Amino acid sequence: MARTEMSVRPTPPSSVLRPVTALQPADASVTREFTLRKLPNTCPDSMWMINDLGWDDITERPRLETTEIWSFINKSGFSHPMHMHLVQFQVLDRQPFEIIGGQVVPTGPAVPRPAEEGGWKDTVRCDPFEITRVIARFDGWTGLYPYHCHVLEHEDNEM
């Protein structure tokens, strides 16, 4: 039996994070909107949808080397962690709204993302009755970019 001893000096984490170059909204060639909601008069927890579509063909086809803004409009009383595959994005802002006469009506200005949401993401929390905007640069992948809610029951039912 052998015994090995090592001297380990823990290194404290850096107090300075690597800077992240912010993507600029002016560089976005496309803005897309995704409405998150539960369809009325359906099974209790099974019909959460994006843009009222389920099990449909591909509806978004970002072009390689382009920048896009995606707005997640959460019309539900439930937070949705929206996840995008094969691309990282930055959170831009959130804007509260009410639904008046079936229309989304902002109730205040867009609020810039908090510091803890700085940096690159692949999942963003979309809170109830808020528009959450993210910006992404579609580089390095010529295939499809799947996206979905990361709540398992919602994901399984095509949200």
Kindly label every feature range from the protein language model.
Residues 1-140, 151:
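Edge beta-strand plus adjacent loop/short-helix module at the start
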